[in-house]
Amino acid sequence: MFATLKQVVGENWHWRRQVWNLAKIDLVKTYRGAALGKIWLFAKPAVYILVFWVALKFGLRSSSDVNGKPFLLWLPAAGVFPWFFMSDMITTGSDVYRRYPYLVNRIKFPLSLISTFYTLSLLIIFACMMAFTTVVALLTGVHLGRYMLQLPLVMGFMFLFWVAWSMALSPLSAISRDFSNLLKTLGTPFFWLSGILFDISGWPRAARLVASFNPVTWVVQSVRDCFIYNKWFFTDWESFLPFLFVLLIFVVLALHNYHRLYMEVPDVL
C-alpha cells in the first residue's frame, strides 16, 4: 500500500504541470462556445443569489439572520455553492475513467492524474464562487472576520477527500455500469440528508454523530464556520475527527483499488 502511495504521489508530482494544464483545459471546455466565456463562472452564483433573495423576500417572506449574518449567506453561498462542487464529484467524479477514455488508453499517462485534474478543475470553479461571495458580502456591509483565513484549508481538505473518492470508486465504475448508475442515484439523498437546507445543531446527539461521518455535512458546516459562525473548524472535534476517519478510509480504498484495478481499466474501456 505504501508503495502505491509513493507511486501515486510521485506521478502527481512529476506530472504536476500537465495536471494544471489539463485542469485549465477542462475548465475552458466547460464554457467553450459561450460568448461570455469565463463570465459564466460568476454569473451562475449571481443568478442563484438573486433567485434565493426573491424567493425568501417575496415568496416565503423570510429575512431572519443567522448569527447576525444574512440568511442568503447561510443557505445559497455557504450551503448550495459547496454542493455544486460535491454534486459533480459524487456523480461524475466517481466515473472519470469513462469521461476521459482517450486518456485511459494512452500507454504512458498515469490514471491517478485523471482524478486529480478533474477535481482541481471543479475546485477552481468553487474558488471563484467563494471569491464572488466574499466580495458581495463585503460590498453589502457584512463583516467577515479572521475565520475566513481557514477557507483555503477547508478547500484543501475538500480536494484531498474528493480525489480519494474519485480514485477509490472510478475503477469500480469503469468495470461495472451498474455500480456507476448506483452512485449517480446518491446525489439526491446526500442533498437532503446533509444539512444543506437546515441546521443540524438541533438534531439529537446520536443523529448528529451519525451525520458527522457524512463528508458533505462536514464541508458545508466548515464553510459556514468561515462565513457565519466565526469559529475554527478544527476545534469541533466531534465533527472533524469523524471526517478525518472517513478521509483515511477512502485514501486506503483509493490505494487498494488503484493498485488492483488500474491495469484492467484500459482493457475494459
Q: Predicted regions span which residues?
A:
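Hydrophobic transmembrane alpha-helices and immediately adjacent juxtamembrane helices
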Residues: M1-L269
